[in-house]
Amino acid sequence: MAAALTDMADLEELSRLSPLPPGSPGPAARGRAEPPEEEEEEDEEEEAEAEAVAALLLNGGGGGGGVGGGEAETMSEPSPESASQAGEDDDEEEDDDEEEEDESSSGGGEEESSAESLVGSSSGGSSSDETRSLSPGAASSSSGDGDGKEGLEEPKGPRGSQGGGGGGSSSSSVVSSGGDEGYGTGGGGSSATSGGRRGSLEMSSDGEPLSRMDSEDSISSTIMDVDSTISSGRSTPAMMNGQGSTTSSSKNIAYNCCWDQCQACFTSSPDLADHIRSIHVDGQRGGVFVCLWKGCKVYNTPSTSQSWLQRHMLTHSGDKPFKCVVGGCNASFASQGGLARHVPTHFSQQNSSKVSSQPKAKEESPSKAGMNKRRKLKNKRRRSLPRPHDFFDAQTLDAIRHRAICFNLSAHIESLGKGHSVVFHSTVIAKRKEDSGKIKLLLHWMPEDILPDVWVNESERHQLKTKVVHLSKLPKDTALLLDPNIYRTMPQKRLKRTLIRKVFNLYLSKQ
């Protein structure tokens, strides 16, 4: 046993001083030693077994444990914790190898079973008799303490898949090109150094080692938690340590004075309004007041009213000093007129709530277009409704009939003029004889004062006894003498009503 420990120390020192060839594992892959009783009983058999195994491993490119000086190291009984975690494609081979290892340990050193477990095992860890061997492409991990204590060999990461002739990563963190990449979850994906330092492993909360996939899942879940924390606006520890800072949602709004040659800036609208009122409005003298606000539509337009300028500047400052006096209402207005229009709405709402328990929302706050539409519908409905009082009674009908008869007797519109012409009758009021011997007669037309008197020959007297003239050809100034309703200036509705009445009177006169 002492000789075996001495050889182990010599091999470790040689591995430190001389570089190892690719594919050969360092002494960090050694396992636990068996008890002295087993070593003495099977010393000779295991020496031959170790030499055969070492030759097979070196010829096959696999990383076997360092065996030298003819001294063999005993193989420890495998424990559940000493089995390295393999990739997903090597699960079946790992189960078979574990069964073979159990048989070899229980059989007391059978050469064939131990050789198969050393050469064909796909689990991590380089070994001779003392440690379990790594298959080609696997990463070895250190387990030796250097003082003969039993050290548990645990994997640092998942092995690469077995490839033909590819060496695993050695104890000096050398990764061969024949196998897949070996990832270490603890210290950057390499095995422990040859100095016997124990590789760091990621341990779960219950003490079990984490595989590569478990570690990656935990890392990805941590990253997702951080992303969700940042997106939701919560402060992360990194932010609290100064690596990040949360910005406040509220921003200070600056109110700048845009008056010509004024660079004042305020933090609130009332302060800006006081500044404009005291400096720019009240400071103007001479009876002429102008607004010098940049971009104003009445820029530099003179006015004689200072109160107008004060009200106008409220549109620039945004201040609304006129607040509603009704309790519970927070409305404010830029002008007193707006406040005066707002206050009655509170009382109208109270009255409407008494009349109707469910007032319409549109009536409480109607738009201008809605008001005009309702007004038109209301007026249309009012015109269509029948009138409650009708003053066209029998007495009125008799008076209209009398006036129609008198008008017809004087103008003969209905009897001779067919309803649209006036019939004039002539009478001789004078007679004269000219120098040529002709006799002239002066005719006077009835109804009077409509047509002027005219001189005609005596031979034309018979033809001019009557004269029919259309109403449209009568002079307007004299046509009103027939009846005041002719050419009377009145609204269109009353004119239409009058014409209907005239037609009705004429119809009655025919009866």
From Swiss-Prot:
Name of the featured protein: Zinc finger protein AEBP2
Gly residues compositional bias, start-end: 59-71, 160-169, 179-190
Subcellular location: Nucleus
Chain's gene name: AEBP2
Major localization listed first in the record, in broad terms: nucleus
Organism: Bos taurus (Bovine)
Sequence ranges of Polar residues compositional bias: 346-359
Cited InterPro entries: AEBP2/jing_C2H2-ZnF (IPR052130), Znf_C2H2_sf (IPR036236), Znf_C2H2_type (IPR013087)
Composition skew (Basic residues), residue ranges: 371-386
GO terms assigned for molecular function: DNA binding; transcription coregulator activity; zinc ion binding
